[in-house]
């Protein structure tokens, strides 16, 4: 349909997009619906349905969000942004097959669509497509999974073994992928539990209050003495079965003047975190000397900076900072404003597939570039 004479409609669409950036989601949705009532031809513009779909997606109204994105595609079958958004939406569900399929469609329409490419790479850490649905990205992922470690994980790992493995992976990737840039800098392996950190931090930054969930979020923090030991920890998290039952990640922490090479294991109780700390020390004694730091902590750095008492951890919970009861009201306000039904959406968590992936390699490559190695 020709929309070239829809000047008023596109001006109004720009106002809706601006509202999406500045105002609450529910106010933006009301504004968008009222706009369509005043200017019915907005219904003929795919970008209108796409922005409404994004609002509904963030409000966790997935059913209406899907309908909105599908309307955009019906109006313009080559509207790649709507396919991408459907890929993001289904990633938030258990249907990774649909997520992969929609992202694949977005890339087929726009070959240089890097956002879709990067999300597709991430999905391949959790999902293996059938051969008939493979594409050049999944083919690279399969090839890198076939690169042998040539490492004995029952004894100490040398720096040279890590270097050799990374170089072998890079040879495989460079044969098939020109652009090694990637939008992630942490290797995050998940298991069953969605920590929902995005919601919790949004509440903290809006209200200066720590959500209830975070008072029961504990972690074992491992600080490696150098970059190569961080790489070793990444492979150990993948290969040692004990760690597979936990959410865990590897990262370079840049909050201080010098880089800190961190590996984190997330735990669900005070008792569990101390158990995991002790077991982790036993396991890692095979690979590292006593200089490695292994410590139990609670919550995120941002919370502890604002409330120093929060980070203090003791074996008796009664000695630790408790959550002020009035902070629960802030959570209720946030969920009321940011979800369709006013209730927290914890979403789903996908189990990471064991083994290296293109996602992991590209994060490591970002680390190497950051450390100016090779």
PLM regions with names:
Residues 117-374:
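Structured alpha/beta or helical-core interaction and ligand-binding surfaces enriched in interleaved
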């Amino acid at each position: 349909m020709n929309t070239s004479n829809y000047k008023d409609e596109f001006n109004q669409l720009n106002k809706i997009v601006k509202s999406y950036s500045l105002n609450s989601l529910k106010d933006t949705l009301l504004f968008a619906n009222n706009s369509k009532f005043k200017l019915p031809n907005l219904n003929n513009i795919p970008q209108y349905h796409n922005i409404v779909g994004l609002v509904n997606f963030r409000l966790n109204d997935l059913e209406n969000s899907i309908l909105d994105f599908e309307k955009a595609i019906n109006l313009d079958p080559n509207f790649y942004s709507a396919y991408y958004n459907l890929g993001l939406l289904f990633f938030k569900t258990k249907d990774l097959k649909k997520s992969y399929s929609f992202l694949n469609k977005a890339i087929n329409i726009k070959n240089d669509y890097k956002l879709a490419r990067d999300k597709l790479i991430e999905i391949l850490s959790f999902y293996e497509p059938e051969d008939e649905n493979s594409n050049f990205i999944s083919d690279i992922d399969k090839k890198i999974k076939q690169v042998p470690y040539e490492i004995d994980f029952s004894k100490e790992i040398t720096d040279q073994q890590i270097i050799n493995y990374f170089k072998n992976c890079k040879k495989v990737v460079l044969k098939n992928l020109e652009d090694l840039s990637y939008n992630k800098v942490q290797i995050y392996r998940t298991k069953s539990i969605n920590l929902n950190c995005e919601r919790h931090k949004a509440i903290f930054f809006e209200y200066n209050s720590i959500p209830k969930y975070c008072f029961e979020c504990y972690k074992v923090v491992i600080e490696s003495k150098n970059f190569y030991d961080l790489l070793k920890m990444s492979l150990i998290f993948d290969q040692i079965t004990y760690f597979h039952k936990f959410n865990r990640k590897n990262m370079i922490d840049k909050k201080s003047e010098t880089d800190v090479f961190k590996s984190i294991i997330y735990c669900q109780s005070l008792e569990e975190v101390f158990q995991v700390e002790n077991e982790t020390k036993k396991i890692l004694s095979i690979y590292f000397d006593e200089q490695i730091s292994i410590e139990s902590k609670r919550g995120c750095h941002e919370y502890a900076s604002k409330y120093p008492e929060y980070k203090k951890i003791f074996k008796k919970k009664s000695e630790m900072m408790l959550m002020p009861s009035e902070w629960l009201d802030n959570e209720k306000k946030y969920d009321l404003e940011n979800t369709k039904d006013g209730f927290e959406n914890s979403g789903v968590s996908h189990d990471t597939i064991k083994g290296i992936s293109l996602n992991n390699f590209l994060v490591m490559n970002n680390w190497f570039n950051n450390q100016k190695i090779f």
